[in-house]
């Protein structure tokens, strides 16, 4: 399962969500919520309250005459029980 998690997302919005005890990850498109919830609870030893996921739209990119699209990915936002935290995001 760890190979399906690409990276933690650190954007302005995700840093703002850290105050609400919500953590954002970029994952492969084939990961579902239940698998990810079990993995987070086992790996980080925390209690997951809810999980939200979305697939942001691709953006059109152009380099010279060649045009294409950015790679599509899946973003998962995990809400933890108050008092729990993931040390990976410690700032």
UniProtKB/Swiss-Prot annotation:
It comes from the Eukaryota. GO terms for biological process: translation. Gene3D superfamilies: 3.30.70.330. GO terms for cellular component: chloroplast; ribonucleoprotein complex; ribosome. InterPro entries: Nucleotide-bd_a/b_plait_sf, Ribosomal_uL23-like, Ribosomal_uL23/eL15/eS24_sf. Its main location: plastid. Keywords: Chloroplast, Plastid, Ribonucleoprotein, Ribosomal protein, RNA-binding, rRNA-binding. It is found in: Plastid, Chloroplast. GO terms for molecular function: rRNA binding; structural constituent of ribosome. HAMAP family: Ribosomal_uL23_B. Belongs to the universal ribosomal protein uL23 family. Binds to 23S rRNA. Part of the 50S ribosomal subunit. This is Large ribosomal subunit protein uL23c. It comes from Chaetosphaeridium globosum (Charophycean green alga). The gene is rpl23.
């Amino acid at each position: 399962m760890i190979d399906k998690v690409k990276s933690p997302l650190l954007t302005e919005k995700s840093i703002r969500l850290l105050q609400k005890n919500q953590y954002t990850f970029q994952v492969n498109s084939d990961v579902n919520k239940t698998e990810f919830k079990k993995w987070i609870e086992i790996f980080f030893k925390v209690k997951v309250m809810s999980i939200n996921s979305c697939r942001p739209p691709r953006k059109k990119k152009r380099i010279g005459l060649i045009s294409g699209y950015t790679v599509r990915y899946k973003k998962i936002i995990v809400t933890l029980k108050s008092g729990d935290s993931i040390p990976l995001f410690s700032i």
